[in-house]
Amino acid sequence: GTTTDTGRKTAEAIIQANPDIDSLIVAGGGGDVLVGANAAIEALGLVGKVQTVSTDFLPDLDVKLENGTMAAESGGHYADPFFAFLLVYNAIKGNYEVPTDGFYEMLFPYMFVDSPESYANYAQYFTGTELPYYSDEIAELADMDFDALNKACAALSVEDVVARHAK
């Protein structure tokens, strides 16, 4: 199963089998596996020596980035439901033709954080009281054709939101 204990035991086994390890990618299983892997690295005294990255944001990610337990993180699947909704909404509005023998493909970006500051910005604009887009920006997105909407989706990042909100 994907538990904290499994994550810890797996990380310990990987580290033991690879004593010169300098990085670890923890993926799958939600945050529990990552919590266990971090516990193993901390218990073995390898914080800052083994750079860990993952795709599961933890509630204490800012602390883990600050103390060197985590090197970077991607995640924050905000774009998935938001842009999926906009695709359907724009199709209903007639902003672009709906194919009957194909589909539109939009690749949703993961959010990336690699410092306590970038995580604080993510928390503020993606999980806090502020949203990544202001209401006027959402109205603009709702009027875009597919290519423009796809470009807006691809541009979404923590840095993009911070820059737009700073205006």
Which positions does each model-derived feature cover?
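Hydrophobic alpha-helical
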Residues: 2-63, 85
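Short, Lys/Arg-enriched charge-dense amphipathic segments
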Residues: 8-22, 44-51, 74-78, 97-104, ...
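Extracytoplasmic/cell-surface-exposed regions of Actinobacterial cell-envelope-associated
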Residues: 16-17, 70, 166
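Flexible loop/turn connectors
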Residues: 51-116
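Hinge/cleft segment of the Venus flytrap/periplasmic-binding protein
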Residues: 87-167
